[in-house]
Amino acid sequence: MTMYVIKRSGRKEKLDINKIRIAIKFACEGLNVDPLELEADAQIQFRDGITTKEIQQLLIKTAAEKVSAERPDWTYTAARLLLYDLYKDVAHLRGYSLRDDLGKYKPYNRKNFYSFVKEYVEKGIYGEYLLENYSEEDFNKLANYIKPERDLYFTYTGIKILYDRYLVRDEEGRVIELPQEMYMLIAMTLAVPEKPEERLKWAKKFYDVLSEHKVTVATPTLMNARRPFTQLSSCFVLTVDDDLFDIFDNVKKAGMISKFAGGLGVYLGKIRATGAPIRKFKGASSGVIPVVKLINDTMTYVDQLGMRKGSASITLDIWHKDILDFLEVKTNVGDERKKAHDIHPAVSIPDLFMKRLKNREDWTLIDPYWARQYITRKIYDGKYKEVKPLPGSHYYVGIKEDGTQDILEPKGLEDFYGEEFEKWYLELEENLPSYAKKKVNSFELWKRLLTVAFETGEPYIFFRDEANRKNPNKHTGMVYSSNLCHEIVQTMSPSKHEKPVLDPETGEITYKKEAGDLPVCNLGSVNLGKVHTEEEIKEVLPLLVRMLDNVIEMNFYAIPEAEYTNKRYRAIGIGVSNYHYCLVKNGIKWESEEHLKFADKLFELIAFYALKGSLELAKERGRYKLFDGSNWSKGILFGRSVEEIEENSRQNGNNLPWRELAEEIKKYGIRNAYLLALMPTGSTSLILGATPSIDPIFARFYKEENMSGILPQVPPEVDRFYWHYKTAYTIDHEWTIRAAAVRQKWIDQAQSLNLFVDPQNIDGPRLSRLYELAWELGLKTIYYLRSRSAMDIEECEACSV
């Protein structure tokens, strides 16, 4: 009996086993796998009318199930089979043949690249800026530059995630582009700000580093560069003032940011505590928790077209009078009315608390409302007859002896760090009335914080004094908190509002607002599996700096404060992926002094060439607007003197010309106020087939369940380096913290530092020691405490690079 298969076009043809074998041969060629094994184990149950799609899916499934730590090459076989399927689907949709005029297999249609993009620009799926900035001739040149063979770099997990989440689809949900077309269109988008005569040159350079998997850009950039709405930034950090208008203005901002898939960090430390007065009515304030719940509910409501809930980290100071309730917002005990299960709590901790903790001394919780009243009056004491809050306003008013008034900027305890903070804290502790403060034992508070962290993985930790001491732009203000993933450390401030003014004739209402600093994360990362020598770093880092600077120009801004801050600071965040693989590839054990030396040498190179790239960009395009007065302008790099850095470089053996670089920076400036931030690289590491960010591997082989299904995970070259890969829950994480401290010397922002602890082999003192060591060694942040399966904690998709 003759059997027929149904092709994608709907046409019937005779079953030809040889065609299946050709597909299997293509998928297995050059790999350490047996094509006959795949053919036999697929056990295809042929029947009349079976579709070619069904046959292909069965082969993909069979190959994916064979992936293991001992036989990792099956991941490339499964990837090729999925690519083969994708090529056929896209060719059928776009109406071209997979064979050229000579019958040679050609998965990419170079001839019609321009007409393809033009069609989907007209349909509103690609952005008009592509046609506005590139001619048909440009498209043809770039189409011919595409390298289809680079598709073979993908693992099965990588291409599956790319297929499910990143490749652009039409209005019916069908994938319309191929991976190398995606990379080229992203490169073209990021090259739009370049001079027209140089645009193709930069598009090719950007394409090369992206498609060779040397770098990757943030999830929003991968998703939205080439689309009409170019929301390319990952995270945003809001500062909420103690004012009802500002609270709800920030709730609105949170909703708008979440609508366009941005992640959020929110600082609530300025808000008065429970029981504080409102307009002189005693005990009227409900405190911080209702605001936390407002943001929580906004994140769940603005669910990004039903795809996923928004994400927000909310930070409160450990001296805030509401801190005890705040620590419980995600626990399963206590009053459910005070819970906010969908936000990520973070705690800001000053040095003074850690000092008192060592001696088990008391700690005073303070209401920021009363602290602000006390400090503001004290600062202006002697200059005015009376200083009092201006009703309905952020400001205070100073009344002079002659009755004239000045508008005054208030200052709270949160507006100081280091010695100034300690001075004011001690004074408040001594002088505030009992209703404005509450005494607790520092150790008991710390113990509760760690217990909650052990149970839930959170709160994140923000060491505020170190963050502000090392802020290269401290001349512009304070850093109160970090972003959702706790790698961004930038100057921030609340916006200031004036009362709305009504025109009674027209009914027009005018709102005036002075924009504060709202940090924006423009992120990208370097794949250390492919880029770790000085020559490689020297080539790639300046390119990545340039790409991210162009993100700022191409970005769509959902809120004006974000654009204002982004254009003033031009902050970027360069991170890394494949760190663990880089170590094992170089024969370096995680728990070793060699690891620390390697990290020191490597991250000095990254820091130097990132700064060098930003310097060269400043020569070409101009320095960032707030450069004058910054540490960079004074020759202070990463919080250290040039002499100290030169000595460090000599010890590393790098001997880089830091003094020459510092002098050039003083003369020309740099383009970007902030440069380095080691973010998580969850989904984008999976696309690259890399180990995530700076984390150790979770296991040598496991299956991860996510939006793309159950996917096999193996680190790079696990068959070759099996015993070199030590897994996260078997590592002594004092080494992790020590390595992070070495890296931090070369990072102007922070690191998304996860700590992994085995519940069976950890106790309270040991856990406390890890956190205390992080503070002692000068870390700025701690991200998750992973005491459960890594798959149980939801990673921030927006920040993921």
From Swiss-Prot:
The active site is at 483 (proton acceptor), 485 (cysteine radical intermediate), 487 (proton acceptor). Tetramer of two alpha and two beta subunits. Pfam families: ATP-cone (PF03477), Ribonuc_red_lgC (PF02867), Ribonuc_red_lgN (PF00317). The record marks 235, 521 as: Important for hydrogen atom transfer. InterPro entries: ATP-cone_dom, NrdE_NrdA_C, RNR_lg_C, RNR_lsu_N, RNR_R1-su_N, Rrm1. Provides the precursors necessary for DNA synthesis. Catalyzes the biosynthesis of deoxyribonucleotides from the corresponding ribonucleotides. The record marks 796, 799 as: Interacts with thioredoxin/glutaredoxin. GO terms for molecular function: ATP binding; ribonucleoside-diphosphate reductase activity, thioredoxin disulfide as acceptor. Disulfide bonds join 235-521. Under complex allosteric control mediated by deoxynucleoside triphosphates and ATP binding to separate specificity and activation sites on the alpha subunit. The type of nucleotide bound at the specificity site determines substrate preference. It seems probable that ATP makes the enzyme reduce CDP and UDP, dGTP favors ADP reduction and dTTP favors GDP reduction. Stimulated by ATP and inhibited by dATP binding to the activity site. GO terms for biological process: deoxyribonucleotide biosynthetic process. This is Ribonucleoside-diphosphate reductase subunit alpha. The keyword Oxidoreductase applies. Its EC number is 1.17.4.1. Belongs to the ribonucleoside diphosphate reductase large chain family. GDP binds at residues 219, 483, 487, 682-684. Keywords: Allosteric enzyme, ATP-binding, Deoxyribonucleotide synthesis, Disulfide bond, Nucleotide-binding, Oxidoreductase. It catalyses: a 2'-deoxyribonucleoside 5'-diphosphate + [thioredoxin]-disulfide + H2O = a ribonucleoside 5'-diphosphate + [thioredoxin]-dithiol.
